Amino acid sequence: MGKNVVVLGTQWGDEGKGKIVDLLTEQAKYVVRYQGGHNAGHTLVIDGDKTVLHLIPSGILRDNVKCIIGNGVVLAPDALMKEINMLKERGVPVEERLLISEACPLILPFHCALDIAREKARGNKAIGTTGRGIGPAYEDKISRRGLRVGDLFNAELFAEKLKEVMAYHNFMLTEYYGCEAVDYETTLKDALAIADYLKSMCTDVTELLDQARKNGDNILFEGAQGTLLDIDHGTYPFVTSSNTTAGGVATGSGFGPRHLDYVCGIIKAYTTRVGAGPFPTELRDEIGDHLGTKGQEFGATTGRKRRPGWLDIVAMKRAVQINSISGFCLTKLDVLDGLKEVKLCVGYQYPDGSISTVTPLAAEGYEQVTPVLETMPGWSESTFGATSIDQLPQAALDYIKRIEELLETPVDIISTGPDRNETMILVNPFS
């Protein structure tokens, strides 16, 4: 009997999901992306060779794995083509192993233009989007005016729908934001040029996954971004435009939620955030510099410097609740090597002196709190590349144990370096 496993981020993204997905896909027949778009950046290092994927599931580097892009993903045809060509140049076969839902909303040039125009108009109140059109594409979906992959297969109807939606968005671009309009004819021509190619990879994803389940195949669902960026449960409005939590699997792929067997929450040994938004445990000192430099904390998609801080247990409790996490994968433990002390945020203190162990429901609430920190001894020994729990110093083991105690959730996998081999699996999610 097969197992259906979800791998998702528990923080603000950049937790190391790509590596863990790649590692676990050795046991999977299907890997499914169910939300987000090419704003994701999943970095995989295999025998020292680095690959960064934004749209195609990380399982593509495993020869026997079928990769699926579900209906919850907003798909930019140009970004998809760029990624396919990059992989083919590296000798990775793609077309025969990539399957796409016809219900995926399309990201088109006017979405990117709107995204950039809006961020510019916000000035110092910018959210920090990637400028890749993700939000505007989801907005069109919710407004029921969006174009989907399947629309490309009827050229006449697509042209009609495109003209209508572009008239609306170009009016906003020119009259409200004072920007140039996006050319309709060019957009139409470029979109239709890829229609037949996309059609060759399209399938009924819901039916495919249900048959795979009945056949006893292992399925892995690959999340993008992180729990604290969820459109409903994150630090709103400093969030992404999709449901990054486990509930997004069902809506973004059509796979029944009762069939999920294990939810693996990727948790970095510290915390980072890229772009704007509240961050109670942020470190703007030499320790923050240490974490950022040693952890090579630069966004895989934008190249932006990430903001580092201590691990926030309060926020992680919310992530456990929302996702019903079965077990954690703790990543980048080695980045803490050499610190005399390590700290965990175990509460939020408000101006009146009260302490809460529950996260606020919006960004404004975070601005009032200061972190209540629990200090633990650090370790001088190197954990980099450790592949056995016996190789970890006692202080590191105590740190891991304390995380498990506070979150009432086991750490089942530990990552001690970027390569897929630099990992210890204590409990196999597929077992």
Swiss-Prot record:
- Disulfide linkage: none
**Can you cite an annotated GO cellular component?**
cytoplasm
Tell me the compartments it is located in: Cytoplasm
| Residues at the catalytic site | D14 (proton acceptor), H42 (proton donor)
Instruction: Check the record and name the InterPro entries matching this protein.
Output: Adenylosuccin_syn_GTP-bd, Adenylosuccin_syn_Lys_AS, Adenylosuccinate_synth_dom1, Adenylosuccinate_synth_dom2, Adenylosuccinate_synth_dom3, Adenylosuccinate_synthetase, P-loop_NTPase
What residues form the membrane-spanning segments? none
Q: Which family does it belong to?
A: Belongs to the adenylosuccinate synthetase family.
What's this protein's name? Adenylosuccinate synthetase
Corresponding gene? purA
